[in-house]
Amino acid sequence: MAYDGKWHDGLQFLADAYTKISSVRDGIEAERNLQGFFMAYLSLNGYYYTAPELELNHGYCDFFLLPDLTHYPTKHCYIIELKILPKSEFNAMSKDGKHTKAELQWAEAVEQIKRYAEAPRVEALRQGTTLHKIIMQFEGWELKRMEEV
């Protein structure tokens, strides 16, 4: 992730681990539970400073992995946006009747993360590294979609 920008396997590993340890009870505070899990694991990474809920363009990204260039010649940084819907709502039709709730949530996440990346602070925070914008969408505790936008 830090040197070659290959983020998929690392984030997939975290998503799989979350699926394995989650239970129905975790769904009560689903988004906070998911964010807490990712915060714990991402913070173990020495290549980045993990900044949760960083304010960017009047919104709060779930995670900004800021490069620790003091200790490592990191070449990539990441904004990660986590989205979650209960299993009962994921494929349900939205009020417009044209899209599922998951499709609408994804479209909103794309707009959101692009807006975060355009924030004036981002240029200074990324310190010349390549910025990756990653969205991870969960159905309950299972990862359904993960893409760089």
Predicted regions span which residues?
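Structural signature of nuclease core domains in nucleic-acid processing machines
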Residues: 3-149
